[in-house]
Amino acid sequence: MEPEPAAQKQPRPRRRSRRVSMLSEEPAAGLPADTPGPAANERCSLRRGSSFTFLTPGPHWDFTLKRKRREKDDDAVSLSSLDLKEPSNKRVRPLARVTSLANLISPVRNGAVRRFGQTIQSFTLRGDHRSPASAQKSFSRSTVPTPTKRRSSALWSEMLDINMKESLTTREIKRQEAIYELSRGEQDLIEDLKLARKAYHDPMLKLSIMSEEELTHIFGDLDAYIPLHEDLLARIGEATKPDGTVEQIGHILVNWLPGLNAYRGYCSNQLAAKALLDQKKQDPRVQDFLQRCLESPFSRKLDLWSFLDIPRSRLVKYPLLLKEILRHTPKDHRDVQLLEEAILIIQGVLSDINLKKGESECQYYINKLEYLDEKQKDPRIEASKVLLCHGELKNKSGHKLYIFLFQDILVLTRPVTRNERHLYQVYRQPIPVQELVLEDLQDGDVRMGGSFRGAFGNSDKAKNIFRVRFQDPSPGHSHTLQANDVFHKQQWFNCIRAAIAPFQRAASPLELQGLPDLHEECEENNPSAGNLRAQRRSCVVPGVMQIDEESALDCGSSVQTVEDTRNMKAQRPQPGLRRARDKAQSGGKKKETLV
């Protein structure tokens, strides 16, 4: 009896479970791929489903099989998952966390994915120290550079007709170039003065960023100088021929240059104006406004102070421009004598402006001095009209001091702040220049912190140091000062030496007899401090003292001690400087260079 067909198809449910477990990868063996049946329908329904919770793993569950992908997906990397845009209320992870994405792609056999991971790591390492917000902000700024407004730099010869150019000599072309440079500079100056008023002064006044009084103090009378330079430009224009040449300009300059004395008040106020502007820059509104102007094309990447300082920089160029015109002017030309006169006029104007500016600067710093003791007040400070030099130095303890050298007195101060106002607190007793002694010290003679050489073994030794002190140590202390570098030390040395020189020349001829020239070595005459103190002050020539050790090549290698000073005071006064020098050479203690 033949079995029934239904009995032969009983194992099919087991085959169906295997097909389901294999996620319909391959058709059943022995059956065509398009064979319809209930198993095929169930397989299609499972493929369309989104959940695998209905599948129960069986003994034939195979984890080694992979889902087949299309070939075009092998090299495709979706960038949508790397969207950097996040909600505003969501915490943004640092950019360094993106490295985990690159590390997850391992092992990497595909070249495109490997290159992508390297790219992620490369820009992650470059941006580890910044947040994504700051990175995007800096990128947005750099992608839109502000175009800078540039001025024409064409030469006069470039605008000249070819036939006209051939008819002029090389010297005459250079002379016309110099005259054109003078005229072009006046035009640029007028534009800058108008720009300072239109782009800075008026908007800040209208927006109430600064008060009218503050703006007047900073800008001064810039509007009053515009007609002055327009007048020179008009005169040069009238003297210009149709072919573009100027035959004579000397008489124009002789008549016009004295009007530059109007800048005395403006230049004298520059120091106070700069200080007020720096103070107002602490205001966020002022800072934001100036920054926006700086990023605008009209500013040419120049800040406000650059525009305010343009008149001063223009003044110092006039002698150079006039000398350049004179250099290319023939000796038999009528302009030669007039140009020489014009050069003398502008030099006199600049001297007057510098003198007025120096007095104003001197008074500005005098008003900022703060005294801790009434004994520190010296009438020579208030009477000072010239500030020879000033700047920051360090004392032997490493503290920063601000030094002022007036024409008659040296003042050491410490910068302080009182009610948001910068002042200079007078430190110790000021030293009059006529009683000032300057000592040059070699590098390593003094250790910063107050210890002398050798006191603390192999420690850092001070460099670029010198000492200032009283001739008579009783009124005050000596000060060991340190400059930032050799250049600044030499500047201070030259400045103090220049201040001392007039008092050396004021000595009597008898006392100066036998004195060597500058930079030569001699011994200071030191009478006793008891009965002949007045004679000592009249005989001692204040100056630069270089202390030597048995050799003139090792100037400044030793330090004057208290014991040496007492021994010198104990000596009897000699009638002449020659005998004092002979005695010092016989003793072999030290040598001093006095200026």
Curated annotation (Swiss-Prot):
A motif (Nuclear localization signal) lies at residues 12-19, 66-72. GO terms for molecular function: guanyl-nucleotide exchange factor activity; small GTPase binding. Residues 174-356 form the DH domain. The keyword Manganese does not apply. Residues 1-74 are annotated as: Necessary for nuclear localization. One of its GO terms (biological process) is myoblast migration. It is found in: Cytoplasm; Nucleus. Residues 1-42, 127-151, 555-595 are annotated as: Disordered. SMART domains: PH, RhoGEF. GO terms for cellular component: cytoplasm; nucleus; plasma membrane. Residues 133-146 have a biased composition (Polar residues). The modification Phosphoserine is found at S21, S100, S106, S122, S508. It comes from the Eukaryota. CDD domains: PH_Net1, RhoGEF. The PH domain is sufficient for the nuclear export of the oncogenic N-terminal truncated form. Interacts with RHOA in its GTP- and GDP-bound states, and with CDC42 in its GTP-bound state. Interacts with the PDZ 1 domain of BAIAP1. PANTHER family: NEUROEPITHELIAL CELL-TRANSFORMING GENE 1 PROTEIN, RHO GUANINE NUCLEOTIDE EXCHANGE FACTOR AT 64C, ISOFORM A. Acts as a guanine nucleotide exchange factor (GEF) for RhoA GTPase. May be involved in activation of the SAPK/JNK pathway. Stimulates genotoxic stress-induced RHOB activity in breast cancer cells leading to their cell death. This is Neuroepithelial cell-transforming gene 1 protein. It comes from Mus musculus (Mouse).
